[in-house]
């Protein structure tokens, strides 16, 4: 059987959800447990102006566990709670295999109705998360969160009930601050509870995705504001906290599935404009240096494909060209390519081999051009439960 379009796009998340075990189902209440253990052995290297580092590793690659509880009220109304963890700490450098403390990736509650849509509150994915179509298991060359945040502390609304337009999803999200200055010892002892500098202060995004009749089309727009350091947090510019103030971004995708061939071709793209504010550095009471405001523009295009080579075996890949320019003269161009093959050994066991290569050139006024290269190849195994 040819692979369905949903399976081609949703990928591993859909697989983990499909393999979840129902541990309780009674009187309108359903509880599911699921997850996966993921291990990859890899070889990677990076080269920047003839300086090379090579790394071989056997490590965790996104192992996770989730629990979902759904309560049906009748007349199409329902409530849902969802918790998903990762088996990796916030400080992976302390453990080269990337296994660490269990952390919360998503935790949210949902109130909804099949006819009117649903409202989601908590740490969750946003409408921007599922916009692009490119497939990858580990080395994805697209970095969508630089354009629009794909998850966070959010209040979101999703609607799927438009008559005659099955496959159309409309969504909107409002992002709230998630990172705040903690209590106790801190570089900012008098700012406890305030949004941490250069972290998301608030944001809004809207989007739509159509996935039916062999056609895929989606677009999302987001405006995200970041907490500025300013004189309150860094009056003399000593901490180097960054100057990001606001990002406006767009992500889009367009694809078509040739169902008779088991082939999906797609084109992803994005554009973002980042505003950086003016700062004043002072090394002494009598001397100040003003860093003027500037804008950074970023864009990419990425054609890709997903093809069912044979039953339970799929080939996928994509190419990306990305350009970043600053109105002060600095420009960066990146070309990247990814290719992979996956095979199901069992309905709950997936193995794959994936490789990626990226080449980056950076030009700045009065400076020598810098070239960077990254190469990665890995063989992975996922066991779902």
Swiss-Prot record:
Residues 1-20 form the signal peptide. Keywords: Cell outer membrane, Ion transport, Membrane, Porin, Signal, Transmembrane, Transmembrane beta strand, Transport. Changing residue 286 to N: In strain: B3 and B4. It is found in: Cell outer membrane. One of its GO terms (cellular component) is pore complex. It holds the Pfam family Porin_4. Gene3D superfamilies: Porin. Changing residue 285 to D: In strain: D1. GO terms for molecular function: porin activity. One of its GO terms (biological process) is monoatomic ion transport. Disulfide bonds: none annotated. Its main location: membrane. It is a multi-pass membrane protein. PANTHER family: OUTER MEMBRANE PORIN F-RELATED, PROTEIN YDDL-RELATED. Belongs to the Gram-negative porin family. The sequence of strain B1 is shown here. Homotrimer. Forms pores that allow passive diffusion of small molecules across the outer membrane. This is Outer membrane protein P2.
